[in-house]
């Protein structure tokens, strides 16, 4: 009789996700994962044909985690793109390893684009572009691209430790960017 598997696919993905959050996506190895999951490498390779298949599931878990992070982020600003930017910068500060995985690392062709990740299932970007258009912005899509370059740059600076603005300063700058870019 075959021995019952004592570790599940979800437990393996959760362990790999923890490694990613703490050390980075590139640090996932079968041995390190086995230690984190509390098993040998055998169950990992019984469930996954290779580490790349596992890493796809970790990426999907990170993408879902970002969507949950954005959904729970307090949104209280009337100025379009401000809450979107504040959430993105906050995620970069709080979860730098996950931010690197989702928004800075190259991925396979079937991975989600940055736009798809940020837009999410709630159409966050689409909604903000609509909101900007309703407020009288002549070209809200172009405005989004301009302000997104600033938002992404600020988030990258947060990951590298070069972003020292507090919440209120970040808020003021995002509002100012919107006003300046909207013309």
Residue ranges and their predicted role:
Residues 1-23, 32, 36, 53:
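Basic, helix-initiating cap at the start of DNA-binding domains
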Residues 28-35, 44:
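Append "Primarily bacterial transcriptional regulators
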Residues 101, 148-166, 180-183:
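Amphipathic C-terminal alpha-helical segment
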Residues 109-135, 141-145, 172-183:
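Amphipathic alpha-helical packing segments from all-alpha helical-bundle domains
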Residues 56, 60-83, 123-131:
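Amphipathic alpha-helical linker/stalk segments
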